[in-house]
A protein has these predicted regions:
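Structural signature of outer-membrane beta-barrel domains
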Residues: 1, 30-34, 71-75, 112-118, ...
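Face-selective signature of the C-terminal outer-membrane beta-barrel domain
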Residues: 1-91, 161-164, 199-201, 208-216
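Outer-membrane beta-barrel translocator domains and adjoining extracellular loop/strand segments
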Residues: 1, 34-42, 76-83, 119-126, ...
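Membrane-embedded beta-barrel scaffold of Gram-negative outer-membrane proteins
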Residues: 100, 107-110, 135-193, 198-202
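Gram-negative outer-membrane beta-barrel transporters
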Residues: 19, 61, 159-168, 185-273
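Residue-level detector of the transmembrane beta-barrel scaffold of outer-membrane proteins
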Residues: 22-26, 54, 63-67, 92, ...
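Outer-membrane beta-barrel strand-turn architecture
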Residues: 15-21, 56-63, 89, 97-101, ...
Length: 280
């Protein structure tokens, strides 16, 4: 039996030196503890500090934001090995532009440097955990467009968004089956190219009811590029479908809301090589 507790605190400052320009400084502190009833269990404790300095310029048609995230994480364990302390600076930049003042069309672009530390489950879960895991490092580039509108009383809202992205991932954390149990591992280097499309509408119905329709589609080409000589070079990484999507229908009324969600995914592979016997 596992029991995890977390204590969280945050403080932030906002400064607006001139019109359209603002600066923020925030710090989050998290204390996490995992206890279990296993003999000689690690019972890890984690202290995490995340501080963000961000500067933003924003007017009615253009927004630009730059930020720098500083992360420090340290673990302590009662038994066994503990991972090294983690320190990292992660920059990010985002832009959003509305080219026509009379339209809701927006064009956006962003760059993020993402640093993901292994979770307690990744590191310490019985038989599956791996204290030798390295943090997952990602450089993420994104370009997209959004548009929304209202078309009279019967169509309250319609919106569409489309984004294309390219990610380079180092030491991606994945779960892979071994002879008897699953094991958390790093996958060297992974290239990810993808497209996300989202549609949503809301219709007004009689008797104070409304109908919400939404759909999403994702294409993700995520391939292992660690070793050009390996058999799985440029093969799709395990348990990551190239195609996936959802469709949802929701009926809202003053008494009870009813929803139906359909999710579909394409072929995936249980192991790094994309061969028929590994397909699921």
């Amino acid at each position: 039996m596992n029991t995890q507790n977390e204590y969280y605190g945050s403080v932030g400052l906002l400064y607006t030196p001139i019109k359209y320009v603002s600066a923020t400084l925030t710090t989050d502190l998290t204390r996490s503890m995992l206890d279990n009833n296993f003999v000689n269990g690690p019972n890890p404790k984690r202290m995490a500090s995340q501080s963000v300095l961000a500067v933003q310029y924003k007017n009615s048609r253009f927004t630009a934001t730059g930020s720098l995230l500083g992360t420090y994480i340290t673990d302590k364990v009662e038994q066994g090995e503990k991972p090294d302390d983690k320190r990292r600076l992660s920059p990010a930049v985002s832009l959003s532009w509305r080219p026509f003042s009379e339209s809701t069309l927006r064009i956006r672009a962003s760059y993020k440097d993402i640093f993901r530390v292994p979770t307690f489950t990744d590191l310490y879960y019985l038989r599956m955990g791996n204290t030798n895991l390295k943090p997952e490092e990602t450089s993420q580039y994104n370009v997209g467009v959004t548009w929304s509108s209202s078309c009279g009383d019967w169509l309250r809202h319609f919106s569409i968004s489309a984004d294309g992205y390219y990610n380079t991932v180092k030491d991606k954390i994945v779960a892979l089956p071994t002879m008897y149990v699953w094991k958390m591992m790093n996958m060297g280097e992974v290239d990810i190219k993808g497209v996300d499309v989202n549609l949503s509408t809301q219709f007004r119905l009689p008797l104070r009811m409304s109908l919400l329709l939404a759909s999403t589609y994702s294409f993700q080409y995520a391939v292992d590029v660690t070793d050009p000589e390996a058999k799985n070079y440029k093969d799709q990484i395990p348990y990551t479908p190239r195609h996936s999507g959802t469709v949802s229908v929701t009926l809202e009324n003053p008494w009870v809301n009813v929803s139906y969600i359909l999710t579909a995914v394409g072929d995936r592979y249980a192991l790094p090589q994309n061969i028929d016997r590994n397909r699921i």
